[in-house]
Amino acid sequence: MLGDSCWVKNFGVSARTMLNKGDHPYMNEPAYKNALAFNPNIVVIKLGTNDSKSFNWKYKADFMKDAQTMINAFKGLPSQPKIYLCYPSKAYLTGDGINDDIISKEIIPMIKKLAKKNDLSVIDLHTAMDGMPELFPDRIHPNEKGAQVMAKAVYQSISALK
């Protein structure tokens, strides 16, 4: 979508949390260190879904602090990247795991505050993926078509604000 002049690198790791006290903190992953070492011009941060699990969300008081730590790390890079924060995708899962009520009523407002505080752009994947449960076979992870819809939403946000 971005063309040959852009080099897109995925440093995502499945099932990771923004919360450093979460069950699988992203900032403890080699991928996080590699993302910083890559010294990108654009950063898209999409975390929060797994933070909504009750055993992670009990540490919600740390969410904004931990997210700010990550934002500051990317802001401090020599490349001074443009940083985008994503609202987590709609979660169609029900039960004791990932909780869309927590995502929509608590995590998204926190991300919104962080974006405003840091003058960052937001990519609203929650709205972009709303009403499309058929694109999430396991009710949480998108299939190929769902990934394309998400990629298009990210692309449109990045290209609109260049």
Question: Model-derived features: where do they sit?
Answer:
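Helix C-cap/helix->beta junction micro-motif
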Residues: 2, 77-79, 118
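Conserved beta-strand segments of alpha/beta enzyme cores
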Residues: 7-9, 82, 119-121
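Generic structural signal for well-ordered alpha-helices
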Residues: 32, 67-71, 108
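Glycine-rich phosphate-binding loop signature in dinucleotide/nucleotide-binding domains
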Residues: 35-39, 77-78, 161
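Active-site segments of SGNH/GDSL-like serine hydrolases
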Residues: 46-50, 73-105
